[in-house]
Amino acid sequence: MYTLTPAAAGRSRRKVIFLGLRGIPEVQGGVETHVAALAVRIAARDWQVEVLGRKPYLPSPEPYVWKGVTVTPVWTPRSKSFEALLHTALGLLVAARRKPDLVHIHAIGPALLTPLARLLGLRVVVTHHGFDYDRQKWGDLAKSVLRAGERMGMSFAHARIGVSKGIVDSVRLRFGVAASFIPNGVETDLPKFGTSYLDYIDVAPRRYVLCVGRIVEEKRQLDLISAFARLNDPDVKLIIVGTADHKGGYLHAVEAAAAATPGVVMTGFQTGEALAQLYQHAGLFVLPSSHEGMPMVLLEALSHGTRCLASDIDANLALDLGADSYYPLGDVAALAAAMRMKLATPDSAADREARAARVMASFGWSPIVDRTIEVYESALVAWKAGGAHRGGTGLKKHLEIGGH
């Protein structure tokens, strides 16, 4: 029977380093939102937590502490093609000097370097956030690299996490390794927010459709703008929140379509209370994506009790919102009709409270943190046992949360 290895000399608490994301806090992205919430809560469980962020995205060029989490900027070029891999490589060299108990790599692109982490003597957990090679923005070479990253991460990590059951099942089937289903979480006990930001952008509560996300091809904002134009309702606006990390043709196309369509407001990236106000007072939230892992923005909208409409991709269907909350991906006419129907249906305070209660019961952070720490402990046991490739003895137990 194996026991956990002692914490590194000179440390009274275990330490985990997060790697593979742009950074925290208030950095655009589902992985970034996930890690920001998770890292703070793990730090509150008496772990030392450090996030190695990408210097161009962080508010300070020097290390800082945010809510008990140390955030360390690591240089990387701001490049669509190379920044994630180069930053991960440099981050692993930093981590090797830090000698943490664990490195937690997020996403399959950065996971390509899991074998390097092993060669550096690091114990590794990898979270699979989605099949990124299905994203429209990537060419054939990038997709091949992402598939290789998935294979390396799943094969060489000491323990693996998938944010959806579909990911976990796929990993088990294709790679023959154990993985634990731990979904994204939502904040509970949200306060009632005012409307100061709504007043600032001149929109009225319940009289707008909201879309939140990075402006990239697979988020399909152009579909939503086209569908909104078909509503032809001057009393309703469309609010698009988000921006692109790298300027390009799709961003310009969305900006042009928004400018040409009356009632469309682009706010850029928002966070904090401004974003919370937009979620809480929306008449309808729409997620028209062609690709998601576990749709964080959809969970956030639901946690505020907001009505939702989403494309019928597997990741969205897994949330089981009801048949009237989905439409066929890419069908602009069907999206417009579904939006019209949703907006015409009364939505009471009781309806919104029930919606929020359901998602909070299934996706609250406390059990997610519990399960993540269990996976960390199993990874340490696997390292001690030398059984990392097949998951080690500590991965025999797979408690599944998420309400399904």
Residue spans for each PLM region:
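Conserved acidic donor-binding segment of nucleotide-sugar-dependent glycosyltransferases
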Residues: 324-333, 341-347
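Conserved donor-binding/catalytic core segment of Leloir-type glycosyltransferases
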Residues: 17-19, 198, 202-230, 239
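Short hydrophobic beta-strand element within catalytic cores of glycosyltransferases
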Residues: 303, 307-310
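Glycosyltransferase donor-sugar binding loop
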Residues: 55-57, 186, 212, 237-252, ...
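Aromatic "clamp/platform" in nucleotide-sugar-dependent glycosyltransferases that forms part
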Residues: 290
